[in-house]
Amino acid sequence: MAIDVNKFESMQIGLASPAKIREWSYGEVKKPETINYRTLKAERDGLFDERIFGPIKDYECACGKYKRIRYKGIVCDRCGVEVTSSKVRRERMGHIELAAPVTHIWYFKGIPSRMGLILDMSPRSLEEIIYFASYVVINPGNTPLEKKQLITEAEYRQYQDQYGTDTFDAKMGAEAIKELLAEVDLEKQAKELKNELKDATGQKRTRAVRRLDIVEAFIQSGNKPEWMVMDVVPVIPPDLRPMVQLEGGRFATSDLNDLYRRVINRNNRLKRLLDLNAPGIIVQNEKRMLQEAVDALIDNGRRGRPVSGPGNRPLKSLSHLLKGKQGRFRQNLLGKRVDYSGRSVIDVGPFLKMNQMGLPRQMAVELFKPFIYNRLIELGTENGGANNLRSARCLVERHEDVVQDVLEEVVKEHPVLLNRAPTLHRLGIQAFEPVLVSGKAMRLHPLVTTAYNADFDGDQMAIHVPLSDEAQAEARLLMLAASHILAPKDGKPIVAPSQDMTIGNYYLTTEEAGIKGEGMIFSSADEVKMALQNHEVELHTRIGIAASSFDKAKPFTDHQRARIMVTTVGKVIFNEILPDDFPYINEPKSENFNGIDDRFFLDPGTDIVGWFKNESLNGPFKSGFLSDIIAQIYARYQVTRTSVLLDDMKDLGYDISTRSGLTVAMSDVTELPEKGEVLKEAHEKVAKITKQFRRGLLTDDERYIQVTQTWSDAQDKIKSMLIASFDSKNPIFMMSDSGARGNISNFVQLAGMRGLMAAPNGKVIELPVTANFREGLSVLEMFISTHGARKGMTDTALKTANSGYLTRRLVDVAQEVIVREEDCGTDRGLDVSAIMDGNEVIEPLYDRILGRYAMKPVIDPKTGEVIAKKNQMIDEHVADQIIDAGIQTVTIRSIFTCRTEHGVCVKCYGRNMATGDIVEVGEAVGTVAAQSIGEPGTQLTMRTFHTGGVALSEDITQGLPRVQEIFEARNPKGRAEISEVTGKVTSIEENPADRTKTVTIEGETDTREYVLPISARLRVAEGDEIHRSEAINEGPLDPKELIKVSSTLKTENYMLAEVQKVYRMQGVGIADKHVEVMVRQMLRKVRVMDPGQTDLLPGELLDIADFRRANAKTILSGQTAATSRPVLLGITKASLETNSFLSAASFQETTRVLTDAAIRGKNDPLVGLKENVIIGKVIPAGTGVAEYRHIKDEVVAAPVEPLEKIPTLDELQKAFDKEPASSTGNKASNSAK
């Protein structure tokens, strides 16, 4: 039963009726037996019966009368087994006919209880009926009893005696519930509930809305309420609940078999009791046990104690197979293990080019096996190859020489994918061309380590081989490492020289005064290199070189070209790796990128040695400047030239750092003679502070602050003394100054003092570590040092887990956001200006407008000239002009105002940060946004800081907790009150008794009072004007409150600014658009306030797009439209409220999502990525976008060239003989067919 998943448009789920379950089934399972312990064959009518589920061996019936494929489809007359493939045992279902109906625990136990809502009964009453504790009146007849009234056993008997046995009808158990459900008139109930809603309020209204929701769901889905009670239980295929023999003759079996066995045993016993006309109480007890057995099968542990197996371990039921990280969704559908993959330790490969990786031969043989076999067969025996698959296999197993030759051929230009877990962003998987290496470790290019966050201390990486031609083409065109130069989060280069490469280039471009060969003048770069080889000059020597000797394309002015340029030997060598028409880089300044300064050019005949004596030295090129050069090259010359430059920079860096012979020794850590003096002063000051405290002049908090401040000042003093005494040739200084490794504080700890340490609770210990590592620490100092360090380690571990979970939730909520069209045609934009925090600029305007489209023309206020037209992309040049013109606010196209459904349009998104080009239709921008926000999560702090000073012990939540608070739309800590009216602050009263203060605001129509804690810092004073939605006191706003009193756009803008504050404070840059995508996803739902004449329900939560559609339909037919208000959902809630039940079920609360979806008969439109991955369909992003899928079909259907001659029978026969061997390689098998 092969289904082509790429053919269907959507997937629907619903309640299965008993008839449907019987239709699925291939037979009834009547016995609890599994397999016979002697013959090891499946028992007849048992849980593994071959007659029901199909043969255990391929094309062979149970008794062995029919064997081989030629009997396919025949049902054996002896054993009744159909001769077919054993794969059917993965798809054929059976069923159990129950002797008494049982309820489905999902619909009775879920919150809210679906049965309870339909029947208008409490879950407790339902439980009493279902588990045979009480009777329920089904038909009161002419007695004073009421329908659905609960009566106890004793009352039932009493009423029977009182009114007679046939006057009323009361039952217990699931059959009673089934009868009640079957009697429900949904249409009538819906009508009554709608009338009730007109005047109901409070709790009553809430319950009515809930009930109406469920009733409408049943009406629209066509599900019948009585289907929530089962007469038949489906039995899943046996290969999904296998039983395998272990060594030693014991069997391991799936828990489900035990659970099914309990159901069958109890069901059979109940049948027997009913046949025997057993007493009611015994039958009741058996029915209750059957109900409990089915409950345990569906969801063990949901009610009462879970059924446990050996060793008191709870058995895994059907629900558990779907739930959680080990469930079907997350373990087998969203993440599968694949063939043609491997993993190994990685090692550095400095000899590789940017797009290469070193693949160990041993791994390559294993990974490329099908291609090797195919090539060996193509070669044929006459060329040392093979004739068929078997002999090809032998050649490979015997490690024949020909295999290595073929391997070289096969691997050539066949890209492979490398992945390092955790894959935090799209650069966690990149494509490389394999280069065969010896050994067992894969070799990785040193420059891609940043993107992978890899190092060579034992990290492992996974490798995958793309098999099809399309997959190889995509890997080559879209995923080659050489084209991944920019980070998707901020568009800055992520590939930059580090460590040895940085220090090499730093050393190369260092200048020294008065060394060998200073002032020599050369006619060309070659001459300079020759002089260096002959030891006439050194790398750092300042020299002159004829500007005319450089390439014509070098952007020198004519005046400069006729003169002598002063530079150093190293800089001449460095500039050789830059493109010919790129300015000569002589000093580490960004102005140099537009051309070299005239001061570096001297007229021929000038006394160059004398000129050098008066000229100060230029700084060497540090890590940051090297990154700037890469960014410039990328902007001007695109990918290919940049990757060439990177490789050259890497080779040059390694070469020079090796030649420089930089080492670190104890003698490089200089001692500071003045240190003792500084410490003495500090000790005296601390003694003075302690004295004042003892006299009662200071509080303990003040004393603590002053003491820690004293030691902090002492450390700063030592630090500045150290920096002053530094020798610029000191290797440790060079390492930190160049940005290769370490920073100044490391040096201070080596040569100065370690300073103050933090305790595990984050508080600073007031006893400082006065020693440094050169002197060595005392026992107490050592203890103080390690005390806080331990906290650092545990924090990091916790942070990683928290950050990973945040990323998972972000990805889930945004995975359906894909660039779906060119232009959505919106008429709204977003006014952006620099994000400020007080007077501090958090994110400048330049960063916010770069790579976005202008919504309105941007006009220079001074000249009136148009800098950017409407819908024009703002690139670096335009952005510079806007900033230079002094413009403070620009209206841009924003994702917040984009009207594209399930995604965004190109114009509202703008530039793709990872490529620097305009985003393409099909780009999965939601996932990229989620990863961009989640990836730096581990760099954020975990702590809640105390602000300085004693008076303000107000906690500020920062770092990861603050980001979570914003995205989960939680009530923020220490939040500010928001004014709900525009008016004047008339009074501020303090009430010391209850430690509050009351702020009164008088608006035009009403007066509001706000009670705040006494410690709150107010933003307003008496007599101030205040606008609606402004904060009354300091602190973060609650976005859920803000959205009630201001516009959606204002709320979105506030959340964007808050997220940016957290990341930018920690020095992490993230493009606005990523945050915009997330915030928009949190605000895509509205709640219906008044449904008007639409089919919507009051209080219903639905997508803005669906709401607009419903209204448009109503307005067109001249009826009253519905009204709604926007709802802000946290990312977890938003993920679960998605239109795709597959995506929601695979995220969290699997059973709840599926219960709800089944009742509503939900249809999953398969618009997001996750739901398509789950069903194995090509995802609707990238080359899987519908538009591109059709193009592919046209290409395939290109006219076929006529065959030159029709093949003879012999030729065909030969082709078929070869076929099994070549079926692994595409070309050969296609031609054979």
From Swiss-Prot:
Keyword rRNA-binding: no
Name of the protein in its database record: DNA-directed RNA polymerase subunit beta'
Listed NCBIfam families: rpoC_TIGR
Catalytic function, reaction form: RNA(n) + a ribonucleoside 5'-triphosphate = RNA(n+1) + diphosphate
Its biological purpose: DNA-dependent RNA polymerase catalyzes the transcription of DNA into RNA using the four ribonucleoside triphosphates as substrates.
GO function terms (MF aspect): DNA binding; DNA-directed RNA polymerase activity; magnesium ion binding; zinc ion binding
Sequence ranges of Polar residues compositional bias: 1221-1233
Name of the gene this protein is made from: rpoC
EC number: 2.7.7.6
Family named by the database record: Belongs to the RNA polymerase beta' chain family.
GO cellular component terms listed in the entry, alphabetical order: DNA-directed RNA polymerase complex
Region (Disordered): 1211-1233
Subunit structure: The RNAP catalytic core consists of 2 alpha, 1 beta, 1 beta' and 1 omega subunit. When a sigma factor is associated with the core the holoenzyme is formed, which can initiate transcription.
Cofactor: Mg(2+); Zn(2+)
Listed PANTHER family: DNA-DIRECTED RNA POLYMERASE (PTHR19376), DNA-DIRECTED RNA POLYMERASE SUBUNIT BETA (PTHR19376:SF54)
Keywords, comma-separated and alphabetical: DNA-directed RNA polymerase, Magnesium, Metal-binding, Nucleotidyltransferase, Transcription, Transferase, Zinc
SUPFAM superfamilies (alphabetical): beta and beta-prime subunits of DNA dependent RNA-polymerase
Nucleotidyltransferase in keyword set: yes
Upper taxonomic lineage: Bacteria, Bacillati, Bacillota, Bacilli, Lactobacillales
Binding site for Zn(2+) 2: C824, C898, C905, C908
Binding-site residues for Zn(2+) 1, renumbered to this chain: C61, C63, C76, C79
Record GO biological process: DNA-templated transcription
Biased composition (Basic and acidic residues): 1211-1220
Binding-site residues, Mg(2+): D455, D457, D459
Cofactor binding notes: Binds 1 Mg(2+) ion per subunit.
